[in-house]
Amino acid sequence: MADPQATNGTGAACAERDASDVGDVSDVGDARDEGAGRVVAVRGAVVDVAFDGGALPALNEALTIPVDGASPILAEVHAHLSDAAVRALALGPTGGLRRGAAVRATGGPIRVPVGDAVLGRLLSVTGAPGDDGAALAADVERRPIHRGAPPLAEQKSANALFATGIKVIDLLAPLAQGGKAAMFGGAGVGKTVLVMELIHAMVERYRGISVFAGIGERSREGHEMLLDMRGSGVLGRTVLVYGQMNEPPGARWRVPLTALAIAEYFRDERAQNVLLLMDNVFRFVQAGAEVSGLLGRLPSRVGYQPTLASEVAALQERIASVEGAAVTAIEAVYVPADDFTDPAVTAIAAHVDSMVVLSRAMAAEGMYPAIDPVASSSILLDPLVVGEAHVEVAIEVRRVIEHYRELQDVIALLGIDELGADDRRLVGRARRLQRFLTQPFAVTEAFTGQAGASVEIADTIAGCRAILRGDCDDWRESSLYMVGTLDDARRKEAAAREADARREAAAAASVAGPGTTSGTTSDPASGSAEPQGARHGR
């Protein structure tokens, strides 16, 4: 649990950001005369306010607290302490706040700007611009961040395929248009890169609206994403909402609701499909645990808040599609200590349609995207949705890779030559399948020098079927690594064989006497030398 005093965030960066929030804080609601109060206690981000007369502000109502020489502080009511006092949580740094400071109830919850005015902009939890663009107009339309999910009768089930162009996802864990998908993984396995690639792919493929919620992540990553989107030309149809890790827990806790309010506006008022991306939902849970501790609630399992399940459900149930417009959510979920039984992870997993599990072992082998083909799953992998051929290939791919994993201990102890002929053949195909399911990403092109590839589902199925059939048994494994379609791999294999032939011809021409043999062969595709027989049937 973070030290409450550490949430004040009185650094220069916070002060500069909040100086730009002045106009937005004054617009969160229409202040009422009878809503005047005064601060009676300040404990880090927790502010107790007394109201001498009139009704108390409602739960989740926004309060504004002017501060001498600084921007007004925005707080949200979370508890009624008595007939004349409430406990509120500040969404900004409380440095400079004193007992006795005047407080004004706004008459409603936090309201954030929506509509075309926010497209291409970076916003804070209160809707204040955080980029170098112009201030939002005073008459821009605003919506409250707190609202219920659409009635069940109006919701539309998610049963249409949402193609991403990423082979391993489309084949083994297909996403649903209007559904929820989560990328589960520990630190450093590629969750954020995968989310950024999905943003790039979705904007190019579907030309819809994208809303990105950066929840408790690094400021550096948020800045890089803003620059990358500007450079790729997709920022114009995207809204970025950030609550970075240096901000108080209340701000990080409410960022998903701000992003949802914007997405719901485009869904309900404009009838537009929306791609909602959240990175990282675990930080939402973590911020909720901090808030729970600050408000004096007893912790539950592993130190989480006792309201963990209800908070996650309230967020996830608002992500819904209606007739004529869909909200498709893709969420990155950090798995602490790679423990998939963590209460936060299991609470989030209960609400998603597709689970994409990123594996540290796959990342260590260089298999990017490091998606575990066996652990990942989707409710859409059904013959009635994706077709019999798709399901048959997906099941066989999983079976072959899983059987290969069962044999890895035997191979490590005795060597692959001790396996039977059928098992050796299966191991070779499993390794080729693993490499074929890797893929270069457009967002990493600047670092790898390799152009990104987007692959149609039909090409992915055809490629996997050919490998399972044995059409590629005599190919180098490296020819299937980091390619798009099987045709790309075929060209890579042909080029490698041609290079081998030229090398052998040159070696033969340079030898004066009888040819000598070498204990190693060179893999031209990977540029590495390895002992003969170590290729497992390349």
Swiss-Prot record:
- Cellular localisation: Cell inner membrane
Keywords of the record: ATP synthesis, ATP-binding, Cell inner membrane, Cell membrane, CF(1), Hydrogen ion transport, Ion transport, Membrane, Nucleotide-binding, Translocase, Transport
- Region spans: Disordered: 1-30, 494-538
Q: Which reaction does it catalyse?
A: ATP + H2O + 4 H(+)(in) = ADP + phosphate + 5 H(+)(out)
Start-end of Low complexity biased regions? 506-529
User: Gene3D superfamilies from the entry?
Assistant: 2.40.10.170, Bovine Mitochondrial F1-atpase, Atp Synthase Beta Chain, Chain D, domain 3, P-loop containing nucleotide triphosphate hydrolases
**Under what name is this protein listed?**
ATP synthase subunit beta 2
* Entry's Gene Ontology cellular component terms: plasma membrane; proton-transporting ATP synthase complex
Positions annotated to bind ATP? 185-192
Q: What class of enzyme is it?
A: translocase
Q: Which domain of life is it from?
A: Bacteria
Protein source organism: Burkholderia pseudomallei (strain K96243)
Which one of the record's GO molecular function terms can you name?
ATP hydrolysis activity
Under SMART domains, the record lists:
AAA
Q: List all Polar residues biased stretches.
A: 1-10
Tell me where the signal peptide lies: none
